[in-house]
Amino acid sequence: QQMITAESIVGLAGMRPILDSERSATDTYAKNASTEYDLMCRAMEQVFDIEQTQQVIENTENINSVWALAEYGGQPAITVLAAPSTEPDKRRANTADTFLFWQDKKAAGTGKRILIVTSQIYVPYQQLEAVRILGMQYGHSVETIGFPREWSGNMSGLQTAANYLQEIRSVLQSMKKLL
C-alpha cells in the first residue's frame, strides 16, 4: 500500500460572495458562510476535524483588495487563504493572483512538488497557470488533478455549456501568456 505524504495542505479560495443559487449546496456544510473563503474554511474543519488556531483578515473598502489567511496547526500544517487582486480596481483575484499570494505568504520556497486538486472543469486552466507561475518562476513541479463531476453534489449545475466555454477561453488566454 502506498501513502501520500505532505508537509502542508493549503485550501485556496477567493472572497467572492456566495450566490443564492449556490445556497442549497453550501448550506449543507457551511450554513452561515458568506464567501468562498468561508466555505473553504468550513470544509477543511469538517474534513480534517480541526479548529482554527489563527486567522488574519485584511479588510479594505474595495472587496477586491481584501485577503484572508486561516491557520490550523498540526502536521501536516493546514492553511486556508484568499488572495487580493493584483488589479483591485478592475477585477477580483484570479488563479494567478492566488498562486502568487500563496507563494509570498506561505514562503513556499523553490523546487517543491505540488499537487493541486480541483473540480475537473478547472484542471486545464489551473495547471497552465500553476506551471506559468509556480513552475516557471519558482521551479516547482506541479500536477493538477480533478475530482469527478458527481463529487460536486448540488454544485454540478454550475458545469453548463457556458461554464465550459468560459474555461476554454481562460485556457486559451493562459496558453497565450506562456508564449
Language model feature labels by segment:
Residues 1-159:
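A structural signal for short, hydrophobic/glycine-enriched beta-strand patches
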